[in-house]
């Protein structure tokens, strides 16, 4: 029976010890649960962190695509409008340059103003994608040519 008494005392002791543990366990359990909940949110935020750069990368790619598309669209638009409106203005200016170069025997005073106008117009046409931006240079060149009798 000594065994029985031991087991009874041990049986009696654990329920007594379990009761305080149960009372103590609920108090630390709520405190322990928020930190346990925080690591999953930390894991969730670390999992969300790679997703956000992915979103930003997609946005950057979209913005780059828009920029490239805009540049291509502007270039095509300038090619179409330059082909219709600028083709007639740019071609007569080139023969004038070829025409003025052989006239190097004439006085420089007659040749210089129109040559400078042609030079400005051609530089504008080469530097600008849209020939319409060079209309002022074209007008000055036409006036010079009319004044000099080159038209």
Curated annotation (Swiss-Prot):
Short sequence motif Cx9C motif 2: positions: 134-144
Gene Ontology process terms (BP): mitochondrion organization; positive regulation of transcription by RNA polymerase II
Feature: transit peptide: 1-9
One of the record's GO molecular function terms: sequence-specific DNA binding
PROSITE patterns reported for this sequence: CHCH
GO cellular component terms attached to this protein's record: mitochondrion; nucleus
Domain CHCH: 111-151
Chain spans, region Disordered: 1-50, 75-110
Keywords: Disulfide bond, Mitochondrion, Transit peptide
Record field: compositional bias (Pro residues): 27-38
Chief site of localization: mitochondrion
Compositionally skewed regions (Low complexity) per UniProt: 10-26, 39-50, 100-110
Stored InterPro entries: CHCHD2/10-like (IPR055304)
Residue ranges of the TM segments: none
Compartment list: Mitochondrion
Disulfide bonds, paired cysteine numbers: 114-144, 124-134
Intervals of motif Cx9C motif 1: 114-124
PANTHER family, per database record: COILED-COIL-HELIX-COILED-COIL-HELIX DOMAIN CONTAINING 2/NUR77, COILED-COIL-HELIX-COILED-COIL-HELIX DOMAIN-CONTAINING PROTEIN 2-RELATED
Protein name per UniProt: Putative coiled-coil-helix-coiled-coil-helix domain-containing protein CHCHD2P9, mitochondrial
Lineage, top ranks: Eukaryota, Metazoa, Chordata, Craniata, Vertebrata
Gene name of the record: CHCHD2P9
